[in-house]
Amino acid sequence: MSGFVVWFTGLSGAGKSTLAAMLSAELRARSVHVEVLDGDEVRTNLSKGLGFSKEDRDTNIRRIGYVAKLIARSGACAMTAAISPYKAIRDEQRAQIPHFVEVFCSCEIPVLAERDAKGLYKKALAGEIKNFTGIDDPYEAPESPEVVVDTGKETKEESLAKILAKLEELGYVPRRGAAVAVSGAAAAGAAAGGARGLIAPHGGELVNRWVEGAAKASLAERAKGLPVIELDERTESDVEMIAIGAFSPLRGFMNSKDYLRVVREMRLESGLPWSMPITLAVSEQAAEGLRVGSEAALRARDGRIVAVIELSDKWRPNKELEAQEVFRTTETKHPGVAYLMSTGPVYLGGEIRVLERPVDSAFPAYDRSPATTRAYFAEKGWRRIVGFQTRNPIHRAHEFITKTALEICDGLMIHPLVGATKSDDIPADVRMRCYEELIAKYYVKDRVLLSIYPAAMRYAGPREAIFHALARKNYGCSHFIVGRDHAGVGSYYGTYDAQEIFNAFSPGELGITTLNFENAFYSTVVGAMATAKTAPGDASTQVNLSGTKVRELLQRGELPPPEFSRPEVARILIESMRSSS
């Protein structure tokens, strides 16, 4: 591959040197020769004697650019990590270097001042230091850099993933089996030359919309004077899922272009596959005072302001079209359609910045963000991870398909949905006790991670199966189990529609591999769990109870056959039904 230059620019303390070091370690692990021209090191050696006048700074950058060009000409990668505050001199280097990648490390002054251990920003702001870049000396931000990383809001690993994705897209570096791991441990593994990369997040970047430190305090204060939008249980969970990156690449609620293409084609406006509209609906009255280009505060049901939305769009959707395309029905008996029709007639689109969790986790021991699960998988050395979505207790059929999937993967993530579900679904706390008991007694614990998925259930069947798969990709799963009637309700979808819908995309577009399973049962012929593919015999040889039949048994305090459910799980369910009756 041709040589190239990665030109980091940004204010002092914005993370240029840190990211250059991380990127160089990752590229060396991919057998790319790298030379890093760090700003302080260059000033000590290459540019010794130069001052801080504009002329001297330009000379410094020209020297760095010349050396970087020579390194790239030799076929290597040169990285520069100087502030390089002036746009004209940076553009001059771009014009002279054939393969030039500008990375703008953006960060707000209050955040930089807070993280500045030397206290230079505070002194500059107080007037004690003169000619300090970004305070009383100008810094001209790039207008069209190849990559922008917001180091005040993103983790180092997330910023690194964005840079790598662009370098891979440009063809400057080889793709690595999957992608860079999004954790410090994984980065260390890469630096050591290990092949421990995980699947890339959807869109190449693990989004992080949390606001922290001084920026958080500033935004929270500003939010007090903004118009308020009330969140409900669904949109509260959506805010959290966007914030933690589970809905990557979404950075907020969809605008009308993304929304319409998702509804009609299951793609974002960029062309990236995405199957579910993620929208913020409001009443006519609430929408009336809001204008595109302004901000609004998002208020949780308990009265707290938890986020701010930067409004980029406002429109009236065709909800009948949305219902038919997404849920395949307009009947309000369908819980997804019922919710859709109950919400306001106006949709608001825009990126969000999140101050606080809308709802505290009911299961903190199992509450892991995508960045956290990725770090866990990397530390375990897992590369092939299969995700299993469930909103029900795990019975023998589920146990069978998860263990079958685990045979071809390094690890299994049991990822129960604990957000809003139907009123007749089994409560999340009861289900969690079932999962704990089952994993403790019937799984190899070192190969299984139990972690909650705090999203709302939408009951969109086939479309939601794709949505669930893409979310698990963001959590680091390379594989995803799709069983019979995934995310279905009633008789609105065919038994295997949720498997067949994946054929709408060409191989590789989704970036995650589905493992499709037929209905599993206990076969009296083979004396084990099986499917119609592996066990002969008619229906009389299959122990396969309906959900209604199981509920009747449990309500009477009777254990289902052990071929259907582990007795430990059944006892927990019986106890729950007795206590709730």
UniProtKB/Swiss-Prot annotation:
<dbReference type="InterPro" id="IPR025980">
    <property type="entry name" value="ATP-Sase_PUA-like_dom"/>
</dbReference>
<keyword id="KW-0548">Nucleotidyltransferase</keyword>
<dbReference type="Pfam" id="PF01747">
    <property type="entry name" value="ATP-sulfurylase"/>
</dbReference>
<dbReference type="InterPro" id="IPR015947">
    <property type="entry name" value="PUA-like_sf"/>
</dbReference>
<feature type="region of interest" description="Adenylsulfate kinase">
    <location>
        <begin position="1"/>
        <end position="200"/>
    </location>
</feature>
<dbReference type="GO" id="GO:0005737">
    <property type="term" value="C:cytoplasm"/>
</dbReference>
<keyword id="KW-0547">Nucleotide-binding</keyword>
<dbReference type="GO" id="GO:0070814">
    <property type="term" value="P:hydrogen sulfide biosynthetic process"/>
</dbReference>
<dbReference type="GO" id="GO:0019379">
    <property type="term" value="P:sulfate assimilation, phosphoadenylyl sulfate reduction by phosphoadenylyl-sulfate reductase (thioredoxin)"/>
</dbReference>
<comment type="similarity">
    <text>In the C-terminal section; belongs to the sulfate adenylyltransferase family.</text>
</comment>
<dbReference type="InterPro" id="IPR002891">
    <property type="entry name" value="APS_kinase"/>
</dbReference>
<dbReference type="InterPro" id="IPR014729">
    <property type="entry name" value="Rossmann-like_a/b/a_fold"/>
</dbReference>
<dbReference type="GO" id="GO:0004020">
    <property type="term" value="F:adenylylsulfate kinase activity"/>
</dbReference>
<dbReference type="InterPro" id="IPR002650">
    <property type="entry name" value="Sulphate_adenylyltransferase"/>
</dbReference>
<keyword id="KW-0418">Kinase</keyword>
<keyword id="KW-0597">Phosphoprotein</keyword>
<feature type="binding site">
    <location>
        <begin position="10"/>
        <end position="17"/>
    </location>
    <ligand>
        <name>ATP</name>
    </ligand>
</feature>
<dbReference type="InterPro" id="IPR020792">
    <property type="entry name" value="SO4_adenylyltransferase_pro"/>
</dbReference>
<keyword id="KW-0808">Transferase</keyword>
<dbReference type="InterPro" id="IPR027417">
    <property type="entry name" value="P-loop_NTPase"/>
</dbReference>
<comment type="pathway">
    <text>Sulfur metabolism; hydrogen sulfide biosynthesis; sulfite from sulfate: step 2/3.</text>
</comment>
<keyword id="KW-0067">ATP-binding</keyword>
<comment type="pathway">
    <text>Sulfur metabolism; hydrogen sulfide biosynthesis; sulfite from sulfate: step 1/3.</text>
</comment>
<dbReference type="InterPro" id="IPR024951">
    <property type="entry name" value="Sulfurylase_cat_dom"/>
</dbReference>
<dbReference type="InterPro" id="IPR050512">
    <property type="entry name" value="Sulf_AdTrans/APS_kinase"/>
</dbReference>
<feature type="active site" description="Phosphoserine intermediate">
    <location>
        <position position="84"/>
    </location>
</feature>
<dbReference type="GO" id="GO:0010134">
    <property type="term" value="P:sulfate assimilation via adenylyl sulfate reduction"/>
</dbReference>
<dbReference type="Pfam" id="PF14306">
    <property type="entry name" value="PUA_2"/>
</dbReference>
<keyword id="KW-0511">Multifunctional enzyme</keyword>
<feature type="region of interest" description="Sulfate adenylyltransferase">
    <location>
        <begin position="201"/>
        <end position="581"/>
    </location>
</feature>
<protein>
    <recommendedName>
        <fullName>Probable bifunctional SAT/APS kinase 2</fullName>
        <ecNumber>2.7.1.25</ecNumber>
        <ecNumber>2.7.7.4</ecNumber>
    </recommendedName>
</protein>
<dbReference type="GO" id="GO:0004781">
    <property type="term" value="F:sulfate adenylyltransferase (ATP) activity"/>
</dbReference>
<dbReference type="Pfam" id="PF01583">
    <property type="entry name" value="APS_kinase"/>
</dbReference>
<comment type="similarity">
    <text>In the N-terminal section; belongs to the APS kinase family.</text>
</comment>
<dbReference type="GO" id="GO:0005524">
    <property type="term" value="F:ATP binding"/>
</dbReference>
